[in-house]
Amino acid sequence: MKLGFDNEKYLREQSEEIRRRAGRFGKLYLEFGGKLMNDFHAARCLPGYDPNVKLRLLQTLKDQAEVILCIYAGDIERKKMRADFGISYDADAMKLIDDLRNLGLLVRGVVITRYQEQPAVQQFRAKLERRGVRVYYHYKTAGYPADVDTIVSDIGYGKNEYVKTEHPIVVVTAPGPGSGKFATCLAQIYHEYRQGNVAGYSKFESFPVWNLPLDHPLNIAYEAATIDLKDKNMIDPYHLEAYGVSTVNYNRDVDAFPLLVAIWQKMTKGSCPYKSPTDMGVNRIGFGIIDDEVVRNASRQEVIRRFLRYQCLFAEGSTDRDSVERAKQLMDSLGLRTEDRVVVEAARRAAEEAQIAGKGKAGGTIVSGAAIQLQDGRIVTGKNSDEMHAAAAAVLNAVKTLSGIPSKIPLIGPYIIQAVSHMKQDILKVGYTSLNLDEALIGLAISSATNPAAQIAMEKLSELRGCEVHMTHMVTPGDQAGLRRLGCRYTSDPYYATNALFNGEQ
């Protein structure tokens, strides 16, 4: 893989900038936008980027910093999921606390934002508090966004519980976007000034990249990733007016800036230290780019992946047509087609060939194809059958290719497949027998105990991490679980494999 990003250069630049900004205030509330860890969007767009580089950054600051974690009450109530891990935001919040503690970072507490006495939220608070985690409620801000006098008052920010902190840098982060980090920072600063303390605010957000062009594929990829939030990149008009320099920001920050200035002046009874939304930021990610063309190409691929994902979400009823159309507009702006993702055509061709040959499942009435692009660029395909899903077949064919094992040699013994099929159909009565990818991986592990070829192939599974995968039909939960464990970047066409509304298939 060609690298487009230098983590060490970025870490040096970023830590210096945060320390410099913290030096301007007695205490700095630093809003960490995006994902604090496992930032796979950045890793996909910036080849070479460490998905956990922000944790490494915090480790360099751990003697000066502590963490407040925010989570929106509505996300807890509706069990919002992280698509890349398949876990809920509340579970991710607990995982994040564990990970931060394991790195020696102090987690001061969890702030539940826009709390409305939801039972699920109360249960979540009780669970955390019984495990020794401090939890605070913040409420919908009275008067927001028009009435600054009410916002900056005891019934506005003053109504929120104050989180007592000790370190000069307070990192305010969250499992995902829309969690109330900005409001939490301002509420904390309100309480600081009420107590006679001086505190400041800055924003650390990787995207959009302020010092890259508005139409750079990396910035467009960010917009594609946040379509559900209705984010749009734009030139920062305040920065242009103040400095005569064109920088990129996004609509929410630009729209909120006049309000921030008014709130800041009301809270501190002084002038705002920032002349633009760009001024507020401390992002140095653009300075870590070492090969612009590599980053451009990777970002173009991310835009295609996002479009394919929104098509599937629409088919599931999880998003609206506007989101699909917006994703298509972004793809068109870069002159892209879905076929520019090479595994797309390969998967479709595999399905077509299977259909012509009368292969597939249920006598050829259900035909699916899958394709994997290996790290060396080779494409390996798989087709579904009565024995296994297309994703499972493609993965097994991929590890055969990597191991130099002839295609005719079976990796999972027929007796294992037959035993699993018997259990599923005759004992568990699940109504289907073919192995999904997750089941096939277990079958491969069992076979490896007696089959040397399976043992060799199993050792190659780690080489599939980061490989591109496409399937011609919507991915089942069992295939998703396997692909996530392997670390593959997968997409699919927005079609169900059958017309059945429910078939129990995993």
Language model: regions and residue ranges:
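Short clusters of small/polar residues that mark proteolytic maturation junctions
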Residues: 383-384
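Flexible phosphate-sensing "switch/lid" loops adjacent to ATP/NTP-binding sites
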Residues: 1-171, 188-354, 358, 366-367, ...
